[in-house]
């Protein structure tokens, strides 16, 4: 577990969201860089049946701010959020849905 304190932790519980993840991470990165925030993006794959975990692993490999956790089965949003809060190192913690319904532009 990283002990580096970030300005913001963004926790994203998800289930079968492989298509939206690259766009979401890119959008969050853009907002954080515009406002000069240090940040981490914590994605919790809640037992997805699609390739969400492969996408998370690929994003984490390219970006040290991205971390992922994978549940073997679907435990529900509350359990995924709980895991995210346990892992978060941010002074401020924000939760977002992975389906692009929440705009990262609202973070600041």
Model-derived segments and spans:
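Structured catalytic core of nucleotide-sugar glycosyltransferases
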Residues: 1-108
